[in-house]
Amino acid sequence: DPEMSRGLGDVYKRQVLHTDSWREITRFIISGSRKVRICRKTAETEVTVTLNLNGEGCCSIKTGLSFFDHMLEQIARHAGVDLEIGVRGDLKVDEHHTVEDTAIVLGECFAKALGSKKGIERYGFALPMDDAKAEVLLDFGGRTWLEWGVTLKREYVGDFPTEMARHFFASFCQSGQCNLHISAQGENTHHILEAVFKAFARAVRQAIRQTGGGIPSSKGCLA
């Protein structure tokens, strides 16, 4: 009915869920929306991240650093979350601010989307890729800490400075309120980094999964 349609206006702006997936509808009814959007603008960068923990691995990533985009895509696909990231950074100065601020906003999105963390697994871990082996232990328990046991032989992979990998995860830990232990070894630096990001994504996938109804802590809260 065209007249009714005009009266309702733009329905898409009002609805909280738009999907033809029964699986996603079921998850939404049980857990509610776990989708957030955060924008952060400084004199150095402008970062916008949209994260849906109840997603299906869809992503659109544009940071200005091709290899970094490739790594962030691994997070979306292997964690099974929908992720949109748009970054305008001062790359003419350095890659540091772009990588750091992306990690900060991504971590904030996870912290906000998880909310009280009711019903989640909380913990996650994972592993390998070709010659490289990576292990990531993750706890979304609210305590921030990073243990980094990764040796990278090359200074750059593509347009990405490898020293920023550790800084990315350190920044994510702080804003995402999580504990990360990452270790990896191998011959090819590209493979090592990709194994780390994929293992991280698989750990995230396990940790954010909702399997119960209570807070996964004897304290009764996670903060």
Kindly give the residue locations of the regions a language model identified.
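Single conserved hydrophobic/aromatic residue that forms the stacking wall/gate
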Residues: 1-12
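Short acidic-hydrophobic, aromatic-tinged amphipathic segments that line or gate anion-handling sites
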Residues: 14-21
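Structural preference for solvent-exposed beta-strand-turn elements
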Residues: 26-223
